[in-house]
């Protein structure tokens, strides 16, 4: 059984794969202040709830865009699982040809998504990941990672309205009853949702025009389903794209180590 861990700025998503299939997954808040023991006890409870234990896990891979949290997570893996985790970063074999000016600037989550997207859906491809930031990644027909777009995430936009406008409340991100809001909350919900749908459609349209291609558009992340239901440019929603990519990278690198006799 392989344990995969995707750490974002707001949430961390954990999963366990068995024989190539995602058996279970969990989502928890990213907490930069938790210790290795606190993370260990939390993961222990999650596993035990599914009838699993640390001993069932034979390998671990971690992707993180939050560097301060990595020490605690690596120590947790070594202390409780007795396994040194594979970390997505320099030295890991991704198989990606990255055309960024500085490939090291490409976030681990974007690399993992690209690996999974190419394997599952082919190319050319646009991957939209609705996280703390919303990222758009373009992979051309030759399976080269060409770059993309980064925008503030939906929750950041909603929180900015709440924190910077004294009379506007904090809202739930959900579809309002109508585009034309009849009260402050529904007007804000309409602005956030349909404003974001417009952003997605506009950026995807411009990316396609610049690439002179008609790539398939894959959406992932917590709010992908909500946005896709209102948009006409998203072809597939894959909520577990990142976890699948982590598993693929683990298998690829574990096989390479085995071939080298490590």
Curated annotation (Swiss-Prot):
Keyword flag Nuclease: no
Extract one GO cellular component term from the record: cytoplasm
In Swiss-Prot or TrEMBL terms, this protein is called Type III pantothenate kinase
Q: Where does substrate bind?
A: 100, 107-110, 184
The answer, when asked if Electron transport is one of the entry's keywords, is no
**PANTHER family, sorted:** TYPE III PANTOTHENATE KINASE
By sequence similarity, the record places it as follows:
Belongs to the type III pantothenate kinase family.
Q: Which residues form the active site?
A: 109 (proton acceptor)
Q: What does the Swiss-Prot or TrEMBL cofactor note state?
A: A monovalent cation. Ammonium or potassium.
- From which source organism is this entry? Bacillus mycoides (strain KBAB4)
Q: Which GO terms describe its molecular function?
A: ATP binding; metal ion binding; pantothenate kinase activity
Sorted alphabetically, which InterPro entries does this protein's record hold?
ATPase_NBD (IPR043129), Type_III_PanK (IPR004619)
**Residues engaged in binding K(+):** 129
Q: What is its EC number?
A: 2.7.1.33
Q: Which Gene3D superfamilies match?
A: 3.30.420.40
Q: Which domain of life is it from?
A: Bacteria
Swiss-Prot/TrEMBL cofactor(s): NH4(+); K(+)
